[in-house]
Amino acid sequence: MTFPDGITLVTGPSGVGKTTLLRALHGELGTSFSSIVKGQKTSLMPQQQYWIGYMTMYEQLSMTTGEQWQTIAEALGLQSHFHKLPDQLSIGQQQRFWLSWVLADNADWILLDEPTSALDDDWATATISLFDRFRRENVKAKMIIVTHDVRLLQGNIHNHRIAL
């Protein structure tokens, strides 16, 4: 299996292995899929984000990606939430923070599992625009997005689509 540069949407019914595909590409399962990305950096946004409860979002994100995440987080409307703890944020806000973290990681492969599932239409639209900008600015990077979200499917930002 090969993945072209740009954005690939992976769709299909629940339970067919879309999340498993992302985990395999990320190297979590020790499968032959790991050889596809061997020697390249991957960054994964899982469906459920896990945070350190006693650290602010600013502390957590700065600890791993430096300051690059802030510009992305600001584009996602999060600047007033930098010094909040995870449990003070909605699931959608947490999802946008994780997305800013992953995109700031400068990985060769960006693996996103349902990245807009907790977002309202306005923030989903902003996120889709961010994906489109990423695609244009990082022509050699690969972004694999697992989704059921019609907004992403109709957003016309992807280069390729795989239906499982």
What are these regions (language model features)?
Residues 121-123:
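Helix N-cap at the start of a conserved alpha-helix in ABC-type nucleotide-binding domains
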Residues 48, 53-69:
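Q-loop/switch helix immediately C-terminal to the Walker
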Residues 99:
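Hydrophobic anchor residue at the start of the ABC signature
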Residues 67-81:
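Conserved ABC ATPase "signature" region
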Residues 26:
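Helix-to-loop junction immediately C-terminal to a conserved catalytic motif
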Residues 85-89, 93:
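Conserved ABC ATPase signature
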